[in-house]
């Protein structure tokens, strides 16, 4: 088992918490992390690019001149690709760039980035984040008490809406529920702050 410090909301230490070594103590695999980040970034692409082919360009229904007898090359439409203002041939069309990796690869990538955060001592566990009202100032004070000042990913239990609202206006802070934990967000953050209930949810899914 891997052990890390457990903090209270006020920043004081509240003992240690044992982490599942099968999740937080694996040998980080950079290759699967790279492949997973590529997959996630590809899925973020809108893919709405499009051009007009000759059938989509307005006009061009009438043959510009008769087929024979003019001495000019035969033409059937002023919207053919060789004409200025004509349609585009083999241009981009709307498409989805998303694809899926095998589940075992995705799970290994998630375990790898979590284990790397533990190795880098950038993994902070808090026993809970409870607020009476969604106050940004109070959430910022909690992070300051935890000595977290860099780009941070905060992972909350799925039903902690108040804390999520309290952090949404903070720069360099991203809040996600435990069920939304992903490789790209973890790798992009300098610090990962997770509540103990959220940690239990993550271990339940990945164990």
UniProtKB/Swiss-Prot annotation:
**What is this protein's record name?**
Large ribosomal subunit protein uL4
| Subunit and interaction comment | Part of the 50S ribosomal subunit.
Keyword rRNA-binding listed? The answer is yes
Q: Where is this region: Disordered?
A: 49-77
> What Gene Ontology terms describe where this protein resides (cellular component)?
ribonucleoprotein complex; ribosome
Source organism of the structure: Levilactobacillus brevis (strain ATCC 367 / BCRC 12310 / CIP 105137 / JCM 1170 / LMG 11437 / NCIMB 947 / NCTC 947)
Keywords in alphabetical order: Ribonucleoprotein, Ribosomal protein, RNA-binding, rRNA-binding
Basic residues bias locations: 60-71
The protein's matches in InterPro entries, at most eight in alphabetical order, are given as: Ribosomal_uL4, Ribosomal_uL4-like, Ribosomal_uL4_dom_sf
So what does this one do? Answer: One of the primary rRNA binding proteins, this protein initially binds near the 5'-end of the 23S rRNA. It is important during the early stages of 50S assembly. It makes multiple contacts with different domains of the 23S rRNA in the assembled 50S subunit and ribosome.
